[in-house]
Regions:
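Active-site nucleophile elbow and catalytic-triad environment of alpha/beta-hydrolase enzymes
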Residues: 246-261
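C-terminal motif of bacterial Sec signal peptides marking the signal peptidase cleavage site
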Residues: 25-27
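Flexible "cap/lid" loop of the alpha/beta hydrolase fold
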Residues: 174-177, 181, 189-219
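Conserved HGGG/HGGXW glycine-rich cap/lid loop of the alpha/beta-hydrolase fold
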Residues: 82-133
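Short beta-strand/loop motif that positions the catalytic acidic residue
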Residues: 265, 271-273
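Active-site loop/oxyanion-hole signature of alpha/beta-hydrolase fold enzymes
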Residues: 125-164
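Conserved loop-alpha-helix segment in the C-terminal half of the alpha/beta-hydrolase fold
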Residues: 273-304
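Catalytic histidine-centered segment of alpha/beta-hydrolase-like enzymes
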Residues: 304-314
Length: 332
């Protein structure tokens, strides 16, 4: 299910059809930061369960209740005015970490990743736009891939990292594959729980198209001052008040993201998928034969589901730490 609270894991393939239905009808509120579901995120998390403030015209809407928290952490300001929050911990080669859907930069620390990795790396964590303490654009263009990538590189600049290792989980890994394919600044990449090929396809693509078509006109009407919330159905009104409209816009941005093939990736990359992640492993079957001669090395995480591939830090880092050590370069 799609969570409308940050901190939960949400999945796209193949369960996005259920996610889309939930978003179209009402808000689905998560009550656990470690849900039993193994649904996979490939999209930014939904907004807070508090009623969102009216989106700024042509700008961004901060997450409800996060203004004070955002003031306590460093931020960069993107060219479109979106604030991107980040944190830096540890010393050593730079390691930039991209969180999964329904998560924030804090998720890495809560699971113990920062304590482990900051012993040998300068760990740089950010809230992707639409997440945590970062701003929330209210148009599809606000989540364009080039803007998301520019945010990440700007955070690396602010942290003093000319080049860096990359670690992404879920949606963060989906974004990370574009960086690994496009930027010479990536020394190496660890991509966990992501899929090669299109960002979205098939029923998922159809669901996202419907979601964006439903909610984008409402946001435009709100900005024009013509939206009458009272005229919405009870389900749509509840969903609106839970921030689903902005979530639909963020999710819909994936429709515009291009596919990535293993051969496109320029940096040495460790691709990890839980062996018990059925849809993830189905994707692996499609691409495993295309890895020869590329920079991508695939390893299954024995016995782990999608959720486990983030939650169970010890077996995951048993593969990650040796790979990072083998590709590590001095901090720069």
């Amino acid at each position: 299910m799609m969570s409308v609270k940050t901190g939960a894991l949400v999945r796209c393939h193949p369960a996005m059809a259920l996610v889309a239905a939930a978003l179209l009808c009402s808000a689905c509120v998560s009550t656990s930061t470690t849900p039993k579901t193994t649904e996979k995120p490939t999209a930014p998390p939904a907004t807070s369960t508090q009623k969102p403030a009216a989106p700024a015209r042509g700008g961004t809407t901060p997450a409800a209740g996060t203004e004070a928290a955002a003031a306590k952490v460093p931020t960069i300001t993107a060219a479109d005015g979106t604030k991107i929050a980040y944190e830096v911990s540890g010393t050593g080669p730079a390691l930039l970490m991209l969180h999964g859907g329904g998560q924030s930069r804090k998720s890495w620390a809560e699971r113990g990743y920062v304590d482990r990795l900051a012993k040998k790396f300068t760990v740089i964590r950010l809230d992707l736009r639409g997440s945590g303490d970062s701003g929330r654009p209210d148009t599809p263009a606000g989540y364009a891939l080039d803007k998301v990538v520019a945010d990440i590189l700007a955070v690396a600049d602010a942290a003093g990292a000319k080049r860096f290792h990359l670690y992404g989980f879920g949606h963060g890994a989906t974004i990370g594959r574009y960086l690994a394919a496009q930027s010479d600044r990536v020394i190496s990449a660890v991509l966990v729980g992501m899929e090669m090929g299109p960002a979205v396809s098939g029923p998922v693509k159809e669901a996202l198209t419907s979601m964006r078509a439903k909610w984008q006109p409402m946001l435009e009407a709100q900005k024009a001052g013509t939206l009458d919330i009272k005229k919405l159905s009870p389900g749509d009104r509840d969903a609106w008040e839970h921030g689903v409209a902005l979530s639909a816009i963020a999710l819909g941005a994936l429709l515009d993201y291009p596919p990535v093939q293993p051969a496109d990736i320029k940096a040495p990359t460790l691709w990890l998928v839980g062996a018990a992640d059925a849809s993830g492993m189905e994707n692996v079957k499609q691409f495993e034969g295309k890895l020869a001669g590329t920079k991508v090395t695939f390893k299954p995480l024995a016995g782990l589901s999608y959720t486990d591939s983030f939650a169970r830090i010890d077996p995951v880092l048993a593969d990650v730490e040796p790979f990072l050590a083998s590709t590590a370069q001095p901090a720069s």
